[in-house]
Amino acid sequence: MTAFKACTGHWKPIFRIAVLCFCVIASPLSAGTPTVTKLQSTSRDYVLWYRNFDSPAIRALVELALQKTSEYGDFQVIRSEALSQGRALRELTIGQSHLVDIANVATSAERESVMIAIPFPVDGGLLGFRVCVVLPESLPKFANIENLEDFRASQVRIGQGAHWPDADVLGANGIPVVSHSRYEILFRMLQKERFECFARGVSEVLYDLEMEQNPDLVIEPNLLIAYPMPSYLFVAPDDQETAHRLQLGIERAIYDGSFSDFLESYYARAVKDLNLEQRVVIALENPLLSEESRNVGHRTLENLRRRLNILSR
């Protein structure tokens, strides 16, 4: 019995690489698949939140969706100012902001109520599968953790962004959280031992460490923290055109296979290098999701086993 089976018992080993688990989700934008009549050709600049712009995978997905919808006109994706996540989402929420047009963040019922979500997990749902970035001297604290009760008893503190839904998810599961509003500062706080684990998504952690270039930071090798946490593209509540364009573009990419190619290109390496299938899974509940996103998230967790088998080949 693998570590995964031991910890997850009821999870069924069924998966189709990140596409079929959500390509039939009902859209909040319309009653069915959005259709586009012939549009007057225009050109538009789309300001993408700087953290997403700096992520090759997220920027590539946004550009893929825009490329698939040429009837909307030419486009250019521009890097936003260095806004905190909270500031970027506030700018989107108020609408008509010139500072940011698109942001990819973890979803929550509250976020979906004040912005338009494009309801496709951009990384196939991998954001909800998290590993710990740690200092080497902290590794013994993780050695005997086999389940959530062990994790709580270890008194390991997890660092997270103050505006991230993850902080509330972890807290709701009885895990102590230390937070800061700036992502970059959290790495410094880890080095100063303000907490023991900086939990980062499987889809982002290798890129994070490549950018940090800090030999004092390592990835804890045995644990995988898992909870339903779909990561969506969000736009302002009054920007229906961008929402429809992004959704239509992603749907077209799913149906022509280029979305699968995108996932393979940007995320297969992480699954292989992080040895996810052999890790002990610490399964958490996420009380923050809307009913729709809860269904998406749980489907993703239930399909984890086959996801890992496919991507690790």
Regions of interest found by a model, annotated:
Residues 78-100, 172, 184-203:
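Short helices/loops that flank or line small-molecule/ion binding pockets
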